[in-house]
Amino acid sequence: MNKKTVRDVDVKGKRVFCRVDFNVPMENGAITDDTRIRAALPTIRYLMEQGAKVILASHLGRPKGKVVEELRLNAVARRLSELLGKHVTKTDEAYGDAVKEAISKMNEGDVLLLENVRFYPGEEKNDPELAKAFAELADIYVNDAFGAAHRAHASTEGIAHYLPAVAGFLMEKEIEVLGKALSNPDRPFTAIIGGAKVKDKIGVIENLLNKVDNLIIGGGLAYTFVKALGHEIGKSLLEEDKIELAKSFMEKAKEKGVNFYMPVDVVVADRFANDANTKVVSIDAIPSDWEALDIGPKTRELYRDVIMKSKLVVWNGPMGVFEMDAFAEGTKAVAQALADAVDTYSVIGGGDSAAAVEKFGLAEKMDHISTGGGASLEFMEGKQLPGVVALNDK
């Protein structure tokens, strides 16, 4: 990575504004999954050990520029204290005199968590005044929030113009793993693209068709491709306006010598419910009033074989409606194949795929689970991420 990291700056005795991604799922004021907090620990611990005064900033949810009591970061501060085994001071604002006062009382190795940065309208507008107010709190800026790197916000991009700006360890790892996958992949290189809609994955498919040896399609978006081949898809998800695009993708794959894999059989249901009547049918035999909600057993075997023969697999998007157990087998089969393929480096592209490997208890068996759904998607589209671009070059 050609960006400076925390290793390249002397942080001893310095105030370090570290943007992290603590946007964790909450229910009734309690954190239901602390993966994102844990992911930032190596950088936080390093800064503490090096004698920095660590000032952490994050967003939580979508308060839209105003204070929402349920989205305060108090529960996050408590959980972080437990994980670090050290008290974390939490402020009620993210900048201003009270915050400066709290920072002035910090010793080397202390940790302070600012209030939710999205309580301020200037954050998402990337307001230079807010960015300057954040910068006034510190001597050095560290961005370890890969999950927010595709956003040009005051705490992810704006502040980097006013302070020395470097990457944290998580940011560094994400860019290195995803960067290598796109620029110098081990082969055979397979991409598995699922999820509900073609329109969300157009950029990824376009970019990856130039790089992969195998492209596997699943999830709701597959049925637009099935329709493009001239098959009837019953009541399955269809994006009518994307049929021609689907055709062009398949033609491009052929031109480039990319093996394009689509479902050969599917699990269909008579309604969208976990207790619906279901059956397995061949891809060209979907009944007119049924809908396909998962890939079938033959497809699972086919996809497993491709995965097992690959050296690198990037997976983004589930194979079916995995939230319902009746339609989770396809997604589970892909996750299991990745877990079993010991010679295959697996990169899970955040979002639903990450949630799926967690759900099936296979997260530990994956080589890299990206912490950023949207960010990893944009990275795989070949886009520059504003939060990364803003950091100092080596």
Swiss-Prot record:
Catalytic activity: (2R)-3-phosphoglycerate + ATP = (2R)-3-phospho-glyceroyl phosphate + ADP
Keyword field: ATP-binding, Cytoplasm, Glycolysis, Kinase, Nucleotide-binding, Phosphoprotein, Transferase
Modified residues (Phosphoserine): 183
This protein's name: Phosphoglycerate kinase
Phosphothreonine: residues bearing it: 299
Database matches in Gene3D superfamilies: Phosphoglycerate kinase, N-terminal domain (3.40.50.1260)
Location relative to the cell: Cytoplasm
GO BP annotations, alphabetical order: gluconeogenesis; glycolytic process
GO cellular component terms given for this protein: cytosol
Subunit note: Monomer.
Binding site for ATP: 201, 323, 350-353
Pathway: Carbohydrate degradation; glycolysis; pyruvate from D-glyceraldehyde 3-phosphate: step 2/5
InterPro entries referenced in this protein's UniProt entry, alphabetically: Phosphoglycerate_kinase (IPR001576), Phosphoglycerate_kinase_CS (IPR015911), Phosphoglycerate_kinase_N (IPR015824), Phosphoglycerate_kinase_sf (IPR036043)
SUPFAM superfamilies: Phosphoglycerate kinase (SSF53748)
Any one GO molecular function term: ADP binding
UniProt binding sites for substrate: 21-23, 36, 59-62, 118, 151
Entry EC number(s): 2.7.2.3
Family to which the UniProt record says this protein belongs: Belongs to the phosphoglycerate kinase family.
PROSITE patterns in the cross-refs: PGLYCERATE_KINASE
Organism per entry: Geobacillus sp. (strain WCH70)
